[in-house]
Amino acid sequence: MTIKVKRVYEHPEAADGTRVLVDRLWPRGLTKDKARVDLWLKEIAPSAELRKWFAHDPAKWTEFKQRYRAELKDKTEQVGELRAVAKKGPVTLLYGAKDEEHNQAVVLLEELRRRL
């Protein structure tokens, strides 16, 4: 299974495979046509409370990862759907955050690889 992460604002490429948005909110200023999202799994994103608490603060990264992984344990249906898509071909997890290292897609990718 090939799974990677990418900012949704980056240019879509054929190599992206199935493009899955893993944000709870639609990215600002981006039309559906430009985003070229194949699947929007907003339910797999961190809860609104966790997202607001984290606020993309790198100092909270370690605790954010722990809390988000705990939330993912209750999202088996969504994780299963994502794994099923990944078994069919390449998948790109899309996120809107500016920080490429500290975002939920990075944690989700780690978790998917761990569960494979």
Whereabouts are the PLM-identified features?
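Residues lining hydrophobic/aromatic ligand-binding pockets adjacent to catalytic sites
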Residues: 1-116
